[in-house]
């Protein structure tokens, strides 16, 4: 099946194929093409040229995935992280991100294929049309230096607010 919408700025197209216990969704727009296959808990029933899902949860999964794909191919997803701490530095070497976040050695990770990384001072800007990949990569970067609740240092989201704990009272 194929669905397309054509307005002045928002142009996208969705194709989907339904098998016994799987749905393959392909979205395309001005930013690119995303293809994802979802495994279903129950099988799909076809009656009178209409598809029915036995499990209501499966239909919510498909709707949510289609919404994410439409937003991704129209505008994309952007996540901003900031390094807070004395001497915390990040460098981009080829397709690898190298972080110096207070350990005796550098921490490095490979940038996924669909994710674009831009560095501005102590900020890391991640951009992709695939929400799953960009959020997974951002959470991986956050695990390299967790937030210190007493000092407020670490790798944070740009709008993340930290409530500092009280230190020892002497």
Swiss-Prot record:
Pfam family, one: Ribosomal_L6
InterPro entries in the record: Ribosomal_uL6-like, Ribosomal_uL6-like_a/b-dom_sf, Ribosomal_uL6_a/b-dom, Ribosomal_uL6_bac-type
Keywords, in A-Z order: Mitochondrion, Ribonucleoprotein, Ribosomal protein
Protein name (record): Large ribosomal subunit protein uL6m
The keyword Ion transport appears for this protein: no
GO biological process: translation
Molecular function, one GO term: rRNA binding
Subcellular locations according to the entry: Mitochondrion
